[in-house]
């Protein structure tokens, strides 16, 4: 927050997430949200994510973390009141959970998915078809935020043979 104070707030886009993995009571989750605002020294967030949706027991865990305790309703109210400008979620799970979240009567402003530039069909360790995820978001007009476009950095580590071929073709360019 202190570093952000050096710049006009309207020039920044601030994103953070709710990582309520263990103690996901309403009270603790709301406290976590307010603590983020306090530490960031801001009165609104541009992007707020429900972090790592789809893990644990899938739909049941999502309900435990956000629905049954009223946390999602709280966050929707915060968005309505302007303290959250865009509400979304980062996805790490099965297609069943992904489709379920899209079926809810909630206007999601964005969704963060794993996708890399080489293989859209196997975007993560869970072998989730990122092409499907992206397509479903596009059909609904929901912006996709991409995480791990370099597959956790593995795609940026080229073997010597490939580096040599790239340098041979365009020696003046970086291999990145």
Regions found by a protein language model. Name each.
Residues 1, 53-176:
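Beta/alpha (TIM)-barrel catalytic core signal, keyed to glycine-rich beta->alpha loops juxtaposed to Asp/Glu
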Residues 8, 41-44, 49, 83, ...:
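Short loop/turn motifs at secondary-structure junctions
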Residues 4, 37, 79:
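Conserved hydrophobic residues forming the short capping helix/wall of the S-adenosyl-L-methionine
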Residues 38-62:
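Active-site groove signature of glycoside hydrolases
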Residues 23-34:
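Glycine-rich anion/phosphate-binding loops
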Residues 10-22, 44, 48-51, 113-117:
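A short, structured active-site edge motif that brings together acidic residues
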Residues 8-11, 36:
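A contiguous, low-structure linker/loop signature
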Residues 1-8:
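Aromatic-lined substrate-binding rim segments of carbohydrate-active enzymes
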